[in-house]
Structures are given as C-alpha cells and as structure tokens.
Amino acid sequence: MGKEKSHINVVVIGHVDSGKSTTTGHLIYKCGGIDKRTIEKFEKEAAELGKGSFKYAWVLDKLKAERERGITIDIALWKFETPKYQVTVIDAPGHRDFIKNMITGTSQADCAILIIAGGVGEFEAGISKDGQTREHALLAFTLGVRQLIVAVNKMDSVKWDESRFQEIVKETSNFIKKVGYNPKTVPFVPISGWNGDNMIEATTNAPWYKGWEKETKAGVVKGKTLLEAIDAIEQPSRPTDKPLRLPLQDVYKIGGIGTVPVGRVETGVIKPGMVVTFAPAGVTTEVKSVEMHHEQLEQGVPGDNVGFNVKNVSVKEIRRGNVCGDAKNDPPKGCASFNATVIVLNHPGQISAGYSPVLDCHTAHIACRFDELLEKNDRRSGKKLEDHPKFLKSGDAALVKFVPSKPMCVEAFSEYPPLGRFAVRDMRQTVAVGVIKSVDKTEKAAKVTKAAQKAAKK
C-alpha cells in the first residue's frame, strides 16, 4: 500500500432525476469500497427482480434502504479511490435532512459534483426557477464549498450530440455564475452514468469531445473523464495549525476509566497532557488519554473522531453541543449574541424580529431568537439593499443579530468554519441557513479542576 492517500470529501448534488444514484453507484462500484461478495449478492437480487440493467442505482438504493432502516452501513461503502485520493461521498441529497447534514455536517465537502441531466426537457426542469439544483448549488457555495465539477449525464439519451452538450455547458455556466462560482475553474464532463461512458475510461462515442479543462492557481489542468476531474480536485489544507476546536457529540461514563467525551476534531490537535476548556460549560481540566477506534493516539487531528478521558469532571457538567479547546490557546467561550448572514430558503410566511426557531450549529441544537434584523442584502453580491427591514421572506438574504435561549458556543465562520455555519430548523424542515460574521463572547466564572491546576504547574 505504501503511503496512505489523502482523504477528500465530495458532495453530489443535482435534481432528483439527474441520475445521481446511478452515477455515484457506478463510481463506488468500480473504484470503491463495496466488497465483491456484496456486489454479487446485489447483482443476483437485481437480476431476480428483473432490475439487471439498473444495477448501479440498485446498489445505491440497497445501501440507502439499509441506512434509512437504521442499519448503519459501513461508511467504507461510500468511498472510492482515484490515483491520488481516497474519496468519501457525503450524503447524496434527496435525503430529507440533506441540508441540515451538509451544514452541521460530520464533514465539510471539499468539492461538489453537480449532476445535470442532459435529456431533452430534463435539463430545463432541473435548472428551472424552483429547481432543487439551484438551492443545492447555492447552499454549497454559501457554506464555503469552493470547488465544483459539473457532470452532464444521460448523454446517451441525446446520442452524444455535441450541440446539446455545448448548449447545456453555456446555460449551466450562467447558472453557476449567478450562484457565485467562476465557470473557468469548473470542469464540464459529459457522461453516461448508466453505461459508464466517460466515467472512468474516456468515451469512444463522442469523437468531437477533446476533454475538459479548468483554471487553477497553478495553471490550466486538463483531463477527459469524471474520475480524472475528481482526481484533479485541489488538495484542501487541513487546519492543524489553528487552536483546538472539538464539538462534543456525546459524553460517556465508562467504569474504571471515568468521563469520556467523544467528538470530531474540527481544528487544531488534541493530545494527552493538554489542559482543555469546555464552553459554554466553563470547565477546565486535563486530558488523560486520547483514542480512536479503541487505539491510543499520540494526538487527534482535524477529521479524527476521538474519545478522550478527562479527570475530575462528571458527566453532568459537560454535554453534547459543548466545545472543547486548548485552555492556553484561544480557549472557546460562550456567547451572549452573534451576528450572521442568513439566507431564507423556504418559509411559508414572513420572519420578523422575535422569531425563535432552533439552530443547528456543529453539534449544538438550541433555540435562538432573531433579535434584530440589521440589514437586507443582495444574495449574490452581498450589497446592502435596506437597513432594518421589517421582515424577511423566502429568497431573502440578511444580516441578523441572534440571541441564544441557552448558553451556546459558536465562532465566526472566517476563524473556525465548522463552528460558524448553521441551519435554522422549524416545522421539521430547514427554513434558512446562516454564516456567522461576529460573536459577542462571554466570560463565565470557570471551574478549574485539581488536575488542571496540577498540570499547569508542570
């Protein structure tokens, strides 16, 4: 095996019928983590049900069905490899909680793959005014996913017609430009997810197709297939050099060991012997040990899901939604209020000051009040349209002051991205998304454990 390949996360977006499942299924199937036995089992079932030609989507449907029934599928199934990367597919949308997942996301996507159906009439439906495609693309951009690949699918259904492909590239370029992407940095790849054309091997059906190209800081990059486009994603920098931020997913009490908080390192590193602070709880203590998958670690780095043992802290003092950080290096704090840019996605009425829905930010799930609507902005340029609007409706973007109903720890998106984006949930759906601009932090009278005092003297 040699050196481990770098990990990247991609999110696959597009209209319901664009062929996302088939395309993703195909990649996972051909380059991926599904073992042969499982594939053979699925193929046999598919054939028995007369769904043989459907096998890629069928593979994905099986995985989805198992996931929806609450059987957690080995996440390896959602992985595939390119020459350079190990790629994890973050939740394919269509899933009801997709937007929430993408924001509170267990992982931030490094790149979005937008699948567009090339079929006659289909393309137009996917990109129409109310299209999901627009919402997903806007969301990806708003949440800081800056790299995009466009795959024009179902090219077989238009007989690999060059003029159709060019027309779609032109329309889609305009569309993504409005969202905020620069089309020159985006590869446009014609594919057939169904037949597997131009996914992994270059297609022979389109003599006119010379390949895709995109501009990067390092110059122009070229390729032919979708796999090559994924392999050409620019390596994201992982924020190990920032101060530690680790939102807690759970806190366990383990006999003979004590209190063990669990969560994903978002920025910085966590090591045994470190003195950490939990916010907004205001508890400071020493980390005794750090482990992942039942193995002791010398340090946990961004992306690692770790459990760590802390001294002199009871399970009652810290909880899910708290954030752990280095007590000596920009420790996390609670907040009295924060200002955020909010985009209203779908709210049936009007939102005015006083509205108090639940915000999902990292692992915290807390009701927050829209305290003041400060200004209404143009969604694309961010330019101010009016001061102190009376209300907001679907499609509006605004700067809003929020006041949490309970102590909460959040950060500015510019400093700690994973702790600076949130979903606004109401009526069992995501009504808005937000990006935090500034935070009014509070100092809480802190509890410093004996272990922390001892460690500080060392």
Swiss-Prot record:
InterPro entries, alphabetized: EFTu-like_2, G_TR_CS, GTP-eEF1A_C, P-loop_NTPase, T_Tr_GTP-bd_dom, TRAFAC_GTPase_members, Transl_B-barrel_sf, Transl_elong_EF1A/Init_IF2_C
Protein's UniProt keywords contain Phosphoprotein: yes
Disulfide bridge positions per record: none
Keyword Cytoplasm: yes
Region (G2): 70-74
Phenotype for E122K: Reduces interaction with YEF3
Region annotation (G3) ranges: 91-94
Pathway given in the UniProt record: Protein biosynthesis; polypeptide chain elongation
Biological process annotations from GO: actin filament bundle assembly; cellular response to amino acid starvation; negative regulation of protein kinase activity; negative regulation of protein phosphorylation; regulation of translation; translation; translational elongation; tRNA export from nucleus
Modified positions (Phosphoserine) in chain numbering: S18, S163, S289, S414
Residue positions where Phosphothreonine is found in the record: T72, T82, T259, T430
In-chain residues carrying the UniProt-annotated modification N6,N6,N6-trimethyllysine: K79
Site (Not modified): E298, E372
GO MF, one annotated term: actin filament binding
Modified residues (N,N,N-trimethylglycine): G2
Coiled coil (residue ranges): none
Residue ranges, annotated region (G1): 14-21
Protein family membership: Belongs to the TRAFAC class translation factor GTPase superfamily. Classic translation factor GTPase family. EF-Tu/EF-1A subfamily.
Role, per record: GTP-binding component of the eukaryotic elongation factor 1 complex (eEF1). In its active GTP-bound form, binds to and delivers aminoacyl-tRNA to the A-site of ribosomes during protein biosynthesis. In the presence of a correct codon-anticodon match between the aminoacyl-tRNA and the A-site codon of the ribosome-bound mRNA, the ribosome acts as a GTPase activator and the GTP is hydrolyzed. The inactive GDP-bound form leaves the ribosome and must be recycled by its guanine nucleotide exchange factor (GEF) (eEF1B subcomplex) before binding another molecule of aminoacyl-tRNA.
Subunit structure: The eukaryotic elongation factor 1 complex (eEF1) is probably a heterohexamer. Two trimeric complexes, each composed of eEF1A (TEF1 or TEF2), eEF1Balpha (EFB1) and eEF1Bgamma (CAM1 or TEF4), are probably dimerized via the eF1Bgamma subunits. Interacts with eEF1Balpha; the interaction is direct. Interacts with GCN2 (via C-terminus); this interaction is direct, occurs in amino acid-repleted cells, may be stabilized in a ribosome-dependent manner, reduces GCN2-mediated eIF-2-alpha phosphorylation and is lost in amino acid-starved cells and by uncharged tRNAs. Interacts with CEX1.
Protein name: Elongation factor 1-alpha
Lineage: Eukaryota, Fungi, Dikarya, Ascomycota, Saccharomycotina
GN (gene name): TEF1
